[in-house]
Structure formats: C-alpha cells, structure tokens
From Swiss-Prot:
Pathways involved: Amino-acid biosynthesis; L-leucine biosynthesis; L-leucine from 3-methyl-2-oxobutanoate: step 2/4
Gene that encodes the chain: leuD
Catalytic activity: (2R,3S)-3-isopropylmalate = (2S)-2-isopropylmalate
EC number: 4.2.1.33
InterPro entries: Aconitase/3IPM_dehydase_swvl, AconitaseA/IPMdHydase_ssu_swvl, IPMI_Swivel, LeuD, LeuD_type2/HacB/DmdB
Top EC category: lyase
Species whose genome carries this gene: Saccharolobus islandicus (strain M.16.27) (Sulfolobus islandicus)
UniProt cross-references to Gene3D superfamilies, sorted A to Z: Aconitase, domain 4
Keywords: Amino-acid biosynthesis, Branched-chain amino acid biosynthesis, Leucine biosynthesis, Lyase
Lineage: Archaea, Thermoproteota, Thermoprotei, Sulfolobales, Sulfolobaceae
Protein name: 3-isopropylmalate dehydratase small subunit
BP GO terms, sorted: L-leucine biosynthetic process
Function: Catalyzes the isomerization between 2-isopropylmalate and 3-isopropylmalate, via the formation of 2-isopropylmaleate.
GO molecular function terms attached to this record: 3-isopropylmalate dehydratase activity
Record NCBIfam families: LEUD_arch
C-alpha cells in the first residue's frame, strides 16, 4: 500500500481536542467534522487538506480524550496518512479502524520539512523524501488488512462475505 502527497506539519502533543474540538462531537457527518479538523491551530486546514495531504507531527499525536471522530475528521478532510514520532494508543487504533494509515517515525519533525512531498510504503514503513529514504514502523498483519479494506467495518463486511462462501 503506497501513499503519497504533500506535507502539512505540526508539533508535539496534538490532542484530540485540537484535531476535532468537543463542540462538534454531537455531529456524525464526516464531511461536517472535516470542515472543523485542526481548526484551533489552523482554521484553513480543511481547505489545505482537501487536495490530499500527509500530516507530519511530533510526539504523542492524538493524545487526550478518546474520540473516534478525530480520525474520521482527518480522513474526511483529505488526510491520507499521519506520520509522527509517537501516537496515543487509542488514537492509533481508532485511525487504523477508520482506514487512516499511521506511521511511527523517530525524529519525524526533524527529518521531514513542511514543503516536502513524501511517498510512504505503509507495509514497510519506508518514507521517501526527495532522495532520502527514512525507515518508520510499518503496519502489518490484521491492522494492514483493516487498512486495505478501508476500515474495520469494511473489513468485517469482507470477512462475512468470505465466510459465507
């Protein structure tokens, strides 16, 4: 699974309240949530991300309260993947379960510039930035299968169909 796109860069400790502010949690429409993704840091994020971007961030991306809407909002906004030094465990699983690839890369914010265009091999974790290949932590096994299906619901539908035949 190869993903590529331009980078939008954030720092450390981007919590779920920044990814999607609590006042929007009562809404379920992914496109509405997308319009408010990252709003506290960048009110224009939705417009920038709509062309398909890769977020590069620092440590503990997705920390804070558990809210599935964070991954949903990012994906619906046009985020193709998130590369970070580390992720909050619950955000990481929510992202996978919603079909949003998340790649752990030590020193990600030092290795990748805001103006970069990156190409990511999700399975191996290799990230091509210009002429440089960076080695992140790839996604394998069932997590990769869930991503390839488009998320946990699509994966379960696929497995149900396979088991019927």
């Amino acid at each position: 699974m190869i993903i590529e796109g331009p980078v939008i860069k954030f720092g450390d400790k981007i919590d779920t309240d920044i990814i999607i502010p609590a006042r929007y949690l009562k809404y379920t429409d992914p496109q509405y949530l997308a319009q408010h993704a990252m709003e506290p840091l960048d009110p224009e994020f939705y417009k920038k991300a709509s062309k398909g971007v890769i977020i590069v961030a620092g440590k503990v991306f997705g920390m804070g309260s558990s809210r599935e809407q964070a991954a949903i909002a990012l994906k619906a906004a046009g985020v193709k993947a998130v590369v970070a030094e580390s992720f909050a465990r619950i955000f990481y699983r929510n992202a996978i379960n919603n079909g949003l690839p998340v790649i752990t890369l030590p020193n990600s914010t030092k290795e990748i510039d805001e103006s970069s265009y990156v190409k990511i091999d999700v399975e191996t974790g290799e990230i091509l930035v210009g002429n440089k290949v960076l080695k992140g932590k790839g996604i394998t096994g069932m997590a990769l299968e869930i991503l390839q299906a488009g998320g946990i619901m699509e994966y379960l539908k696929k497995m149900q169909t396979v088991n019927r035949n």
